């Protein structure tokens, strides 16, 4: 069982990674309260984000190196998802002014990392994952991560629109990109996320022997429901001009269904019923 890090080093790196994530969120919070130069803010936040993501990647690689496959326990999977979310955020931040999202994304990433303290040897799985099935898993993780970013984005759109309608936008809102840009980014992320979710479902139907088998039937049904919600939202956007709170509510609905599909049963089995 090869290990990249000892238990103590793994735990130390976990704490350092969480501190880096929180530092990035703290920089955004401080700069939103002060009149700090935007370029300086972006540089500091991105530097902290890159350092945190690098450390986070090492921790995930350590978990992968144990079993030579993606760790299947709840906390390891949660950490992997938030690593992908953080990487997607960083990639977007280099081309779009979305660094304010760090104030929500990074604290969740820090929590996901900290929940793995003492989990340097993640649980094994008895399922034989061939390369085709691993493609399905990777597509599922990336699509879920992208749609998680969309859910975070929807929170900001909701807050921004409500404060603008009240005609008393605070300093927080003043530091955000325009509402039009925020909505445009939201629907771009939703479009790519839905495309990847479509591929994830398609590969599941192709590569899984029985995608409606008892132990994964709920995941399939909830994922299809999420797909229908997101597809309807994008149709409503292009055909009926849906935006604002309607778009936010549909995003929340689709994401809630997808969250139950990905983590609902795993949470109940591993943390409530204490089963592997």
Model segments located where?
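Hydrophobic transmembrane alpha-helical segments in integral membrane proteins
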Residues: 1-21, 143-147
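Structural signature of hydrophobic alpha-helical transmembrane segments
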Residues: 9-20, 69-82, 215-226
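Interfacial loop-to-transmembrane junctions
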Residues: 236-257
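Cytoplasmic-side transmembrane-helix entry/capping segments in multi-pass membrane proteins
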Residues: 40-49, 75-76, 99-110, 246-253
